[in-house]
From Swiss-Prot:
UniProt catalytic activity: 7-aminomethyl-7-carbaguanine + guanosine(34) in tRNA = 7-aminomethyl-7-carbaguanosine(34) in tRNA + guanine
Annotated function: Catalyzes the base-exchange of a guanine (G) residue with the queuine precursor 7-aminomethyl-7-deazaguanine (PreQ1) at position 34 (anticodon wobble position) in tRNAs with GU(N) anticodons (tRNA-Asp, -Asn, -His and -Tyr). Catalysis occurs through a double-displacement mechanism. The nucleophile active site attacks the C1' of nucleotide 34 to detach the guanine base from the RNA, forming a covalent enzyme-RNA intermediate. The proton acceptor active site deprotonates the incoming PreQ1, allowing a nucleophilic attack on the C1' of the ribose to form the product.
Lineage, highest ranks first: Bacteria, Pseudomonadati, Pseudomonadota, Gammaproteobacteria, Enterobacterales
GO terms assigned for molecular function: metal ion binding; tRNA-guanosine(34) queuine transglycosylase activity
Gene assigned in the entry: tgt
Record's protein name: Queuine tRNA-ribosyltransferase
Protein family per UniProt: Belongs to the queuine tRNA-ribosyltransferase family.
Organism: Proteus mirabilis (strain HI4320)
Length: 380
């Protein structure tokens, strides 16, 4: 992987990630394909929304179908027939989500398989081996996602263990002679001094990119923004920055305002299945009765297959009847909305008018523009 930074506009960055499998224009949003599929979508349909890179889930693909089945096909790209790059998370967040079902120790995490209850073990080394077999274009280190709220002592111990796991991840990645990219994950909760230690330690180890982890786990938006403003300037400018598990359209805009290049989230696909659709001026709940006889298109500014062919009334009908097609059409639209938003962001940076775009975006959705700490160092 090669990262090229073309230009900056304030803190916002415009660039691209170059892989053997293709080019990803940044800032970029990655649809989530947890089990080797973006729910309800073929790879061709996902590509048609404008997506250039997908996210797969190491933890879930390890449990089902498993490494051996994957290797029978070649790798995850061959298994799911996605031709572009794939980033896989390490399994750390899924382990964190298991709660009382898991025991975190220095060597790794012991837990019970949520599918069949058997005892299994996941370590930094094992995560690197699984992701190697998946053929991931971007591999994420194995870390502990520090929960919120956590006191300073817990966050410190968690961050320090994640740093030790980062070294072990790097070592095993290199032993496997993996030629793809490896990203470090910055932890430390909402504590700036701990984030400082994490960034410094990861940069000393050396990675191809750096993710900001442990955010969007329940903390106030002000804390997320504060941590991003504090951490971003410390990440090497020639490396991509990835905000994990984020988020709403506003979160993408605010992340870019603070120097983030990459995002992923289940929100556009999950919300689509629940009838919550993103449009130019906000969100539409398509199952609401007011859409029952609405013959207008979902979003007149959208060029997706759904908007070009179907009315709000039809989408309302499908949703009320729990028809699978409704979930598919909604997903096509929401993913296209996210990709159009990222394209608008990239164009605004190209034209040196990103902050004007930010104000236009918030005016469209009827929300105030969050403050930006202008005293923070620029991320360029």
């Amino acid at each position: 992987m090669k990262y090229e930074l073309d230009k900056t506009d304030g803190h916002a960055r415009r660039g691209r990630l170059k892989f053997e499998r293709g080019v990803v224009e940044t800032p970029a949003f990655m649809p989530v394909g947890t089990y080797g599929t973006v729910k309800g979508m073929t790879p061709e349909e996902v590509e048609a929304t404008g997506a250039q890179i997908l996210l797969g889930n190491t933890f879930h693909l390890w449990l089902r179908p498993g490494q051996e089945i994957m290797k029978l096909h070649g790798d995850l790209h061959d298994f799911m027939q996605w031709k572009g790059p794939i980033l896989t998370d390490s399994g750390g967040f899924q382990v964190f989500s298991l709660g009382a079902m898991r025991k975190i120790k220095e060597e790794g995490v012991h837990f019970r398989n949520p599918i069949n209850g058997e005892k299994i073990f996941l370590s930094p080394e094992k995560s690197m081996e699984i992701q190697y077999d998946l053929g991931s274009d971007i591999v994420m280190i194995f870390d502990e996602c520090t929960p919120y709220p956590s006191d300073w002592d817990y966050a410190k111990n968690s961050m320090e263990m994640s740093l030790r796991w980062a070294k072990r991840s790097r070592q095993r990645f290199d032993e496997l002679n993996n030629k793809n990219a490896l990203f470090g994950i910055i932890q430390g909760g909402v504590y700036e001094d701990l984030r400082d230690i994490s960034v410094k330690g990861l940069v000393e180890i050396g990675f191809d990119g750096y993710a900001v982890g442990g955010l969007a786990v329940g903390e106030p938006k002000e804390d997320m923004h504060r941590i991003l403003e504090h951490v971003c300037p410390q990440i090497p400018a020639d490396k991509p920055r990835y905000l994990m598990g984020v988020g709403k359209p506003e979160d993408l805009v605010e992340g870019v305002r603070r120097g983030i290049d990459m995002f992923d989230c289940v929100m556009p696909t999950r919300n689509a299945r629940n009838g919550h659709l993103f449009v130019t001026n906000g969100v539409i709940k398509i199952r609401n009765a007011k859409h029952r006889s609405d013959t207008s298109t979902l979003d007149e500014h959208c060029d997706c297959y759904t908007c070009k062919n179907y009315s709000r009334a039809y989408l309302h009908h499908l949703d009320r009847c729990n028809e699978i097609l409704g979930a598919r059409l909604n997903t096509i639209h929401n993913l296209r909305y996210y990709q159009r938003l990222m394209a608008e962001i990239r164009q605004a940076i190209d034209e040196s008018r990103f902050e004007d775009f930010v104000h236009e975006f918030y005016e469209r959705i009827g929300k105030p523009v969050p403050p930006l700490n202008s005293s923070a160092s620029k991320c360029d």
